[in-house]
């Protein structure tokens, strides 16, 4: 897994751009039905999980696209990227108010932000592991 991440790092910017465009395009489609699982007397919405994963992938791609070969990342960059991604998530939800059949949903936005925060922590820990492995191999 670590070797795959190291291998994909040089192309991460292209993946990031593609993922950003995908988010913008999909969030601009009018009248998308909400995916739900119906259980005995309960309905579970899958769109919150999808928002979490969508912004988790975006976060990982953003960090992978800016990190160098040594996988060192400064705390200031972590904060700036996380803040930028949160702003993008908010703007993405707000822009949906302009799309017919779509609306601003605070729960969607919270799922986006939660995905960003969880994957930010995961990525920082993962990059430290990769950095330590690179140092050991030298």
Question: In which residue ranges do the predicted regions lie?
Answer:
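Juxtamembrane helix-capping/reentrant segments at transmembrane boundaries
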Residues: 41-46, 74-75, 107, 111
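Small-polar-interrupted transmembrane alpha-helices in polytopic inner-membrane proteins
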Residues: 18-27, 77-97
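Interfacial helix-loop-helix junctions of multi-pass membrane proteins
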Residues: 33, 37-38, 90-113
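"…centered on the first transmembrane helix and the immediately adjacent amphipathic helix/loop
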Residues: 1-65, 81
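Short, charged juxtamembrane terminal tails flanking transmembrane helices
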Residues: 3, 133-138
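Membrane-interfacial alpha-helical segments at the cytosolic side of multi-pass membrane proteins
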Residues: 53-69, 114-130
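Membrane-helix interface segments
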Residues: 10-14, 71-80, 105-106
């Amino acid at each position: 897994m670590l070797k795959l991440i190291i291998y994909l790092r040089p192309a991460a910017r292209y993946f990031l751009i593609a993922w950003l465009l995908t988010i913008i395009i999909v969030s601009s489609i009018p009248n998308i039905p909400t995916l739900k699982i119906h259980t005995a007397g309960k309905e579970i919405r899958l769109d919150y999980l999808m928002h979490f994963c969508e912004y988790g992938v975006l976060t990982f791609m953003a960090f992978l696209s800016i990190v160098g070969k040594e996988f060192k990342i400064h705390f200031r960059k972590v904060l700036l990227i996380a803040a930028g991604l949160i702003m993008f998530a908010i703007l993405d939800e707000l822009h949906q108010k302009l799309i017919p059949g779509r609306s601003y949903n605070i729960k969607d936005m919270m799922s986006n932000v939660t995905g960003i925060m969880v994957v930010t922590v995961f990525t920082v820990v993962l990059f430290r592991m990769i950095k330590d492995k690179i140092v050991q191999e030298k």
